[in-house]
Curated annotation (Swiss-Prot):
This is Hairy/enhancer-of-split related with YRPW motif protein 1. It comes from the Eukaryota. The keyword DNA-binding applies. Its main location: nucleus. The Orange domain, downstream sequence and the bHLH are required for efficient heterodimerization with hes/hairy proteins, and for transcriptional repressor activity. Keywords: Developmental protein, DNA-binding, Notch signaling pathway, Nucleus, Repressor, Transcription, Transcription regulation. Downstream effector of Notch signaling. Transcriptional repressor which binds preferentially to the canonical E box sequence 5'-CACGTG-3'. Acts as a suppressor of neurogenesis by antagonizing proneural gene function. Functions during floorplate development. Plays a role in pronephros formation in the inhibition of distal tubule and duct cell fates and the promotion of glomus and proximal tubule formation. SMART domains: HLH (SM00353), ORANGE (SM00511). The lineage of its organism: Eukaryota, Metazoa, Chordata, Craniata, Vertebrata. The keyword Ubl conjugation does not apply.
Length: 294
């Protein structure tokens, strides 16, 4: 019985199959009878084909990596589990459909795209905080301090996401705008300092310089001020017995850069007291008293 012709394959695929069959026949049957120039040409063709195939796979993998980074849903899931290529393509299609449904919003809105990535990063940091409290600090899930902190951060993230959706009508809101004027976030280690204007800069700098020099703990527990009014790159002479190691490392990092004196809050001299461990043996957490205000 005569077999019917199969039209499922294209002409290019048929030609390629014929060429591959010819090359394989030449390599298997007549390779010994070929001249050195012909065999070298066949080997060079095979090598070029392997290089072209490798470049094609690299382009596909690079494009998938870019899609994994650009699509928010894929970017959010890439840390938890490895995504398949089909999943990345499906998420990309869903994301494009959502953008088309929204009327093209988000294609050219750089602020909306930045807020999207910022909210994703904040959610990841929130998950890291929850893991730190449960693994490192040993807090249980029902611990009231942990519940208050996580709920506060969740509420803050929800407020930021709601504010980002209303950006077109109310304008840009800075990321730290909610924390800037919160009445309960003043830490006991920080002192309130008045803003310095250009007209009274010299008198204010002299006032701070005299105050630091007149304090009995000025040489042992506060930063020295240079004559130009900046915190010079000099490490203060502080006894290691009065400071905890994290505070010492932060003071050492501060001494490497000259900061403007009126731009940051200063540490109080009497706040540099050694931290006392609690009777229960748990590490001292000064931020624990502030969480209740949230």
């Amino acid at each position: 019985m005569k077999r019917g012709h199969d039209y499922s394959s294209s002409d290019s695929e048929l030609d390629e199959n014929i060429e591959v069959e010819k090359e394989s026949a030449d390599e298997n049957g007549n390779l010994s009878s070929m001249s050195p120039s012909t065999s070298s040409q066949i080997l060079a063709r095979k090598r070029r084909r392997g290089i072209i195939e490798k470049r094609r796979r690299d382009r596909i993998n690079n494009s998938l990596s870019e899609l994994r980074r650009l699509v928010p849903s894929a970017f959010e899931k890439q840390g938890s589990a490895k995504l398949e290529k089909a999943e990345i393509l499906q998420m990309t299609v869903d994301h494009l459909k959502m953008l088309h449904t929204a009327g093209g919003k988000g294609y050219f809105d750089a602020h909306a795209l930045a807020m999207d990535y910022r909210s994703l990063g904040f959610r990841e940091c929130l998950a890291e905080v929850a893991r730190y409290l449960s693994i490192i600090e040993g807090m249980e899930t029902a611990d009231p301090l942990r519940v208050r902190l996580v709920s506060h951060l969740n509420n803050y993230a929800s407020q930021r996401e709601a504010a980002s959706t209303a950006h077109t009508s109310i304008g840009h809101i800075p990321w730290g705008g909610t924390f800037a004027h919160h009445p309960h976030l003043s830490h006991p280690l920080l002192l309130a300092q008045t803003a310095h204007t250009n007209s009274t800069s010299s008198s204010t700098e002299a006032h701070h310089h005299n105050r630091l020099r007149g304090s009995p703990h000025a040489e042992s527990s506060s930063l020295r001020v240079a004559p130009n009014g900046n915190i010079a790159s000099v490490l203060p002479v502080v006894a290691s017995s009065k400071l905890s190691p994290p505070l010492l490392s932060s003071m050492a990092s501060l001494s490497a850069f000259p900061f403007s004196f009126g731009s940051f809050h200063l540490l109080s001299p009497n706040s540099l007291s050694p931290t006392t461990p609690t009777p229960s043996g748990k590490p001292y957490r000064p931020w624990g008293t502030e969480i209740g205000a949230f």
